[in-house]
Amino acid sequence: MNSGVVTIIGRPSAGKSTFLNTASGEKVSIVSAIPQTTRNAIRGIVNTTKGQIVFIDTPGYHKSEKKLNLKLQEIAKTRLEEGDAVLYLIDLSREFGEEEKNICSLLIPLQNKTVIGLNKADLKSSKADLVKKELLSLLPDIPQERIFEISALKDEGINEILSLLIELLPEGEALYPEDIYTDQDVVFRITEIIREQAILHTREEIPHALYAGVEDAEMHKNGKELWVRAFLYVEKESQKAMLIGKGAAVIKSIRIKSMAELRKIFPYKVQLDLQVRVNKNWRQKDNIIKKISY
C-alpha cells in the first residue's frame, strides 16, 4: 500500500476546506464564503483500498504585507515542501489572475508531484478551457491527465483525484489508524467550530477581525458531557457590540449553532459558555498570530 502527506494549496475560497471535508467524509475544516477563513495547516485523513492520504489544508494563498497574511503565506510554503504530493485547487468561477500565477511560480519545482483540481466545474460560469491553457503555459511539465474538472461541493471527480494522489505517494504502512479522520485535538476543533459560526453570523470587517479561544474544558457526568468556557475576541468595542447583538441575540445564536455542530463531531454533549472580549489590534501582535496560526 501507499501512504503519505498531500498538501492542498489554492487561492482563498477556492474550495480547499470543502474538498477536505468531502474527501474525508467528515467535518475537518471550517467552510464559509469569507476568504481566508482557514488559518492553520489542518490535517484530514482519507483511507482507500490502495492506501492512506494525510491531507494538509493550508490557508488560502494571498499576497499581502499584513502580519497575519505573511504568517499564512509562510505556513502554505512550508507545507508545500513537506508534502509527498501537492493538490492545487482552482476556482473556475473566478478569473485566472495574479494570485494563480504566484502559486504556479511556487509549484514550478514541484510539478512532478502536483495534481490540479479545477473546482466548481459544475457552474455555468466555469472557464475550464481557458484555465487549462494558462496552466499548460505556466506549468508545462504537468501532464493533462493530472488536471481534473471537479465539484468538491457535489462530490464529483473526487475519487479520480484520490486514486491518482495515492499513486504519487511512497510505498509504506498507514501513518494513522484507519478509524481516525483527523489528528486535531479537541480544543482546537472546538475553537474552529465556534469561529466558523461567528463568521457565518457576521459581515463586513468582523470575520477577519475575530478569533476564538477556549479558557476551560472539563469532562462531566462520567464522560457524557464536556463543559467548555470560551471567548470570541475582536479588535474594537463596536465589533464586540455587533457580535453580541441586540438583546444578545447574535452571540446566543452562535453558541446554540456551535453546540449543535459539536454534537455531530463528538460522541458526547458539549455545554458551551461563550462570551466576547476585546483584544485591541490583535492582528499586529506576534504572540497572538503565532497562537492562532500554526
UniProtKB/Swiss-Prot annotation:
PROSITE patterns assigned: G_ERA (PS51713)
Descriptive protein name: GTPase Era
Keywords associated with the record: Cell inner membrane, Cell membrane, Cytoplasm, GTP-binding, Membrane, Nucleotide-binding, Ribosome biogenesis, RNA-binding, rRNA-binding
UniProt domain Era-type G: residue ranges: 2-171
Region (G5): 150-152
Record-level GO cellular component terms: cytosol; plasma membrane
All copies of domain KH type-2, residue ranges: 202-280
